C-alpha cells in the first residue's frame, strides 16, 4: 500500500507542521470569500488581483519565523507569482510547507436533523491528492461541521462526519499528504461550557474510532478542533483560564497521544479571544502529549487595510 511507502515522510511532515512556536496559516478562502476581502479595500475580484493579494502575503518578510504551513485554495496551489515564480516556491523559500483544502463543501445530511450536514468530496480524492502532491502540496485539510442544539448533534451526524473525516484522512495519506482533521463545532446556541465539553469529547472519540477502523496513521496527522467554549448566546462571560482548562481536559480525554499536534480554528472567536485562550492553554502545567498551536485565517485581514499603500492596487 502507498501508505506504507509514505509513513516516515508523513510523520516528519506532521512534526514540522507542529513545530513549537509556529502555527498554520489558513488562506484557503474560496474565490467569493477572497472577493469580499478585496471589495473591503475597493479592489475588483479578478484572478490577477487575487494573485497579487496572495503574492503580497506569501512574500511578507519573516513570515516563516512564525508560520510552519499554509493551507491553500486550489487556484493558489497552481498559481504563479507576478514575477513568474510559483506560489509554492515562494512559500518553500520561507520554510513554509504548502497544504491544500480538498473537501468540496457541505451537503444536507438526509435522515438527520434539518440543519445537519456532511462534507462532500471523497470521490476521486486519492487521485486529486496525488496531483496536489505532484504540484508541491504536503498536507491537506477537510472540514466537517456539527452544531449543538436542544436535540443535536444527532448520532447520525456525528457518525457520518467522523467516518468522512477518517476516509479523507486515509485517502490523502495514500498519496503522501498529511491530513488535518477538522471537526468544527459551531458556536451558535446558549449552551454552557460543560455541554460543549461533553459533546466535543463524544465527537472527537468517534472521529478517532473511525480513524482506527480505516487504518489511519495517527503519527502522520494533525487535529484542528474548535476551542471548548460556551455557545455564543450563553449569558456568562468566558474566562480564558476556564476555557483553557476545559479545552485541554476535553482533548486529554479524547485525542490519542500519537497525534503530534493540535492546531485550533478560531471559529466565531475574536482575534484577541483566540490568542488569549491559546496562550492560557500553553501555560497550563498539565502534561500535554501534543503541541498546541493555531490554524487561523483571520490574521490575513490585517494586511488588507494597508494594501493600497503597499502598491497592491
Name each model-derived stretch.
Residues 19-23, 63-68, 94-98, 136-138, ...:
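Short, well-ordered coil/turn segments that N-cap beta-strands
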Residues 46, 142, 181, 223, ...:
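Conserved, mostly hydrophobic/aromatic
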Residues 2-90, 97-105:
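N-terminal capping/small domains of soluble enzymes
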Residues 115-127, 155-167:
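Glycine-rich anion/phosphate-binding loops
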Residues 303-312:
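Conserved small/polar residues in nucleotide/adenosyl-binding loops
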Residues 21-41, 94-116, 139-152, 186-187, ...:
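N-terminal small/glycine-rich loop or linker at the start of catalytic domains
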Residues 124-135, 168, 174-177, 198-222, ...:
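Alpha/beta enzyme core
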Residues 217-295:
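Catalytic alpha/beta core domains of metabolic enzymes, predominantly
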